[in-house]
Every structure is written in C-alpha cells, then in structure tokens.
C-alpha cells in the first residue's frame, strides 16, 4: 500500500524513498550570436541576389560593381564558373585537392614542405657572385583539361589552323616537353601567317568592292536625284501654273460678281430715287387737290360726300355681282364635268379612256375647291385614285362580253366533284357542253344556269348592281373564276354611284 510519509518543497517521499524533483533549466539567450547569424544570412542573400540580377541586367551590374564592396570580384568569380562549368566537376575538384597536397620548392623561400612527393633532386644551374645556390624544381604537371575547338569552316586555311590548334591542345594535355611542340607551333605560325595574308587580301578586295559599290550607288543616287529634281520642278511649275489659272479664274468670278452686285445696287438706288420722287410728287399733288377740295367744298362740291357714298355702294354691288357670276360659272363647269363623266361611264361601248376620265375627275376637284361643301369633299375622297383609274373602266357591253366568255368556265366548275383531279376537270369540261342553258325570264333557282341567266338579263337591262350581287353570291371555284369580273364591275358601279351623288348635289347648289 502506497503511503506518503512526508512532503517538502524540494521533493516527495514514497515509502521511505525520496524522489528529488527536477525543475527545467532556463536556457540563456545569446542575442549577439543571433544577430551575427541573421546578419550573415542577410548579407549572403543580398550578395547572391545582386549577382543573379547583375548577370541579367547591365544597369544593375554597373550599380552593383560601383556601390557594393567586393561586388566586382564576386561577379568576376561567378561569371568565370558560369562560363567554365567543367571546373566545378567532380574530377576537376578532386585533382585540385590532390595538387594542394604537393609543394614545390621555390628558391629563397624558406623550408621545404614535408608532404612533397615525387620531387627530383635539385640541380645547380648557375652560381652568382654572392655564392648562392639557386634551387630549381621540376614542376609537377597535372593533366590539363583543355577543351578542343569544335568549329568547321569551308575555307581550307581556317580549317587547317583549327586542326593545328586542336593538335597543339592535345599535345599540351599529354606532354610536358616543349621541344615536341615546336613543329606544331611552326605549322600554327605558318597557318596564321597564311590566314593573315588571306584576311588582308580579303579586306583589300572587300574595300575595293565596297568602294566600287559606293561609287556606283553614288552615281545612281545622283542620277535618281537629278531625275527626281527635274520631275519635281516640272510638277511644281505645272502646279504653279494651275494655281495661277485657278486664282485668276476665281478673281474674275469674284470681280464679275462684285460688278453685278454693284450694278444691281445702283439700279435699286436709282429705282428708289425715282419711286421717292413719284411719292413726293403724289404727296404734293394730293395736298394741292386736298386744298382745292377744301376750298370748293362749300361751293360747287357740297354734295361730294353723298356722291362718294353712292359710288362705294355701287362698288359693293358690283363685287357681289362678280362673285355671283364666278360661282355660277363654277357651278356650270361642275355640271358639265359631272355630266361628261356620267356620259363616259354610260354611253361608251369600247370602255372608258383612262386618261380622259382622270382629267375630268381632276377638273372636278379643281372646280370644287372653293365650294366648302362637306358632301362633295367626302365623295371626292372616296373616288378611286389615279393609279386605280389608270387601267380604265369597262363599259356595259364589255362587262356583258366578259360574262359571256366566263359562262363556259362557270358551267364546267359547277360539275367539278370535291377534291377533283385532272380526270375530274376533263370530265367536267366535257359534260359542260351537254348542259342546256336557260333564257327568257330568269328563274328563281340557285343552280348555276339560273344565276347565269339572271346576271345576263340584268346586264342587258343595265342593272349592274343586281348582276354584281348575283355573281358575288357564288361560292367555291366559281367565285374564284369570277373574281376579276367582280373587281371591274365593282369599280364601275362605285364610280356610277359616286358620280350620281355628285350630280344630284351639284344640281341642288
């Protein structure tokens, strides 16, 4: 059983065993270390960002080199390794580290390193007056990683020079003795000399060709400039002459207009002077007459006022008489026009001439303008327009003739069955010849023969309204066939009715 013996501030005792409590230790803050770490980090970020931006932008690069310490050296270092990435390869880095382990004995420079390997014995080459021994050591050459020139030229001299350079680079990679390089160097020198001579001849030929081309181009430009100058001169002369001609023409027009205006102004002023002189003369004459009348009023001209009043009454009577005569003349013309229109509609056998009918209707409209009669104005508005009357109006005989021509088609249409085809039309046309027509007093039936007989009788008796009513009662295909006849008959009937109304109204005026 767990029993607590005692409790202290520094620990707890369980069953006689004291357990010491451990409080967590507080770490001391080191602000200087944090500051240096942050400063180094920010400096590294600043330099890395500055180098990266300077490689992309020349303006930033100039400012970075000029104002940032060690900016130029750091930028050169970065550009070198950017342009020579092979220097950062693993093999190259390893080789450099191996070379760092070797020391080379340099004369007069102190104690030799103990880590130098494969060092040959130092030989005395020269002895000076100071009796100093100069130690030379053979430098340990490592294999150089020089890249070859990977270029191809069509020119044999350039290609040969490139091959010699590549051969020299290969020799430098593998050999250390400079005596073996002499043939390659001589060949390279001869290739370079040949290349230089060829380059000089090329430059000479190019300069000569450029000078010739420039001279030729100069001549062409001079010729073109002269031709252009002549053309522009001719154009400017022609434009100047044309402008001069237009200015002269415009000046002549303005001068003529001003002369005409001045002449009109002078004539108007003269006319005004003459009119003013006449007015002054009349005023003087009126004043003289007025004085004489005033002087003679009490003598010979006592009854002058009564005479003037009588003359005014006579003038009013004369004006009324002239108005009555004018109205009578207008009414006479209206009656003549209406009678002529009615006569054209009734008595013509060859149809009503459209031009004559339109002229008479327009005359009637002209004569009736000053009457102010509402009935006549309303009838004139309901008359067919000139476009509707341009095709003329059929006479009674023409309507009868057209009805007779339409009768066989109506008989044939009356025999058509519903939804008739070609055979139905042919059979109805054939059987229509065997129908017996009705004549004499019309019957009261509704069959097609009774309708044809009644219409024919009404047309003979000049009852166009009854005939039109009978034809309008037709239905179906028969009504469709007679549509044109109904239009012509209705136009004639409307004209007859309206002209009759006009004739009655004019007779009552």
Curated annotation (Swiss-Prot):
Residues 1-19 form a transit peptide. Residues 20-34 are mitochondrial matrix. Keywords: Coiled coil, Membrane, Mitochondrion, Mitochondrion inner membrane, Transit peptide, Transmembrane, Transmembrane helix. Disulfide bonds: none annotated. It is found in: Mitochondrion inner membrane. The gene is MIC60. It comes from the Eukaryota. It comes from Komagataella phaffii (strain GS115 / ATCC 20864). Component of the mitochondrial contact site and cristae organizing system (MICOS) complex. One of its GO terms (biological process) is cristae formation. This is MICOS complex subunit MIC60. Belongs to the MICOS complex subunit Mic60 family. Residues 55-509 are mitochondrial intermembrane. Residues 202-257, 293-330 form a coiled coil. Its main location: mitochondrion. The chain crosses the membrane at residues 35-54.
């Amino acid at each position: 059983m767990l029993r607590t013996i005692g409790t202290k501030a520094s620990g707890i005792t369980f069953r006689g065993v004291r357990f010491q409590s451990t409080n967590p230790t507080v770490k001391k803050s080191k602000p200087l270390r944090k500051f240096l770490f942050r400063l180094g980090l920010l400096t590294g970020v600043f330099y890395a960002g500055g180098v990266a931006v300077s490689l992309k932008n020349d303006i930033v690069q100039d400012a970075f080199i000029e104002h940032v310490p060690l900016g130029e050296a750091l930028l050169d270092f970065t550009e070198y390794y950017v342009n020579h990435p092979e220097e950062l390869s693993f093999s190259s880095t390893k080789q450099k580290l191996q070379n760092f382990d070797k020391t080379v004995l340099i004369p007069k420079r102190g104690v030799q390193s103990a880590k130098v390997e494969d060092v040959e014995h130092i030989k005395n080459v020269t002895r000076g007056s100071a009796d100093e021994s100069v130690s030379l050591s053979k430098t340990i050459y490592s294999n150089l990683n020089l890249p070859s020139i990977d270029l191809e030229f069509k020119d044999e001299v350039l290609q040969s020079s490139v091959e010699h350079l590549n051969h020299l680079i290969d020799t430098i990679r593998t050999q250390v003795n400079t005596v073996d390089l002499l043939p390659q160097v001589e060949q390279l020198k001869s290739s370079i000399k040949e290349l230089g001579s060829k380059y000089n001849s090329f430059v000479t030929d190019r300069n000569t060709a450029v000078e010739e081309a420039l001279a030729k181009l100069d001549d062409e430009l001079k010729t073109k400039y002269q031709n252009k100058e002549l053309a522009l001169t001719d154009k400017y002369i022609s434009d100047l002459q044309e402008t001069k001609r237009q200015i002269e023409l415009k000046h002549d027009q303005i001068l003529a207009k001003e002369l005409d205006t001045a002449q009109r102004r002078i004539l108007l002023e003269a006319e005004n002077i003459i009119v003013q002189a006449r007015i002054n003369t009349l005023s003087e004459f009126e004043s003289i007459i007025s004085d004489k009348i005033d002087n003679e009023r009490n003598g010979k001209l006592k009854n002058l006022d009564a005479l003037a009043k009588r003359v005014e009454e006579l003038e009013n009577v004369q004006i009324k008489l002239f108005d009555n005569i004018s109205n009578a003349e207008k009414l006479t013309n209206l009656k003549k026009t209406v009678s002529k229109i009615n006569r054209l509609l009734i008595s013509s056998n060859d149809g009503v001439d459209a031009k004559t009918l339109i002229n008479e209707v327009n005359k009637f409209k002209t004569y009736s303008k000053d009457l102010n009669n509402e009935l006549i104005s309303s009838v004139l508005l309901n008359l067919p327009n000139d476009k509707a009357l341009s095709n003329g109006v059929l006479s009674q005989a023409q309507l009868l003739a057209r009805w007779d021509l339409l009768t066989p088609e109506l008989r044939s249409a009356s025999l058509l069955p519903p939804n008739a085809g070609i055979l139905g039309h042919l059979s109805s046309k054939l059987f229509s010849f065997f129908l017996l027509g009705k004549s004499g007093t019309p019957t009261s039936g509704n069959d097609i023969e009774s309708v044809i007989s009644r219409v024919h009788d009404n047309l003979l008796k000049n009852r166009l309204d009854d005939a039109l009513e009978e034809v309008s009662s037709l239905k179906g295909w028969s009504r469709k066939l007679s549509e044109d006849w109904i239009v012509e008959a209705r136009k004639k009937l409307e004209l007859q009715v309206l002209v009759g109304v006009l004739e009655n109204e004019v007779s009552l005026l």
